[in-house]
Amino acid sequence: MEQSYHISWYTPNFINICIDSINDGELSGRIYHCYSKEPRRFANILQLLEISDDFFNKLQFPQASTNARTFILNQTSESIELTKVLSPEKVAENRGEKGTFFLNVQYRQNSSWQGIVNWIEGNITYHFLSVLELLKILSNVLV
């Protein structure tokens, strides 16, 4: 759903998604955030989601309302204090060859994400209630 408000750059989990190529409907590109000078590269949409979810887990924001079950005994990871190394303005300067999206996941409830995504080239902000809705937004805008 198209909204009229914009994403705050100053949320701890602000992510800039730069889409560099689209091959057979598969998106690939880079992810930028304030806690790393180097981008994280993804080759497909699943990697994009895994990298982002791992980032939210390390940041512990937004906190997930459910934990994934596993049959493998997990070691409890200690809380890692992340330090900002880039300003939000620096993160926002990066652009993708095919498209750029600012992502703000506000909640992680019902084993999914809820939040807003801003398509920079189209100057449109969308609200999404699930990862599936987010993927549909990215797909409809780019493919």
Question: What are the functions of these language-model segments?
Answer:
Residues S36-R40, E50-N57, I116-V143:
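Mixed-charge, glycine-accented linear interaction segment located at domain edges/termini
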Residues M1-I17, N23-G25, S52-S111, V143:
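Intrinsic disorder/low-complexity detector
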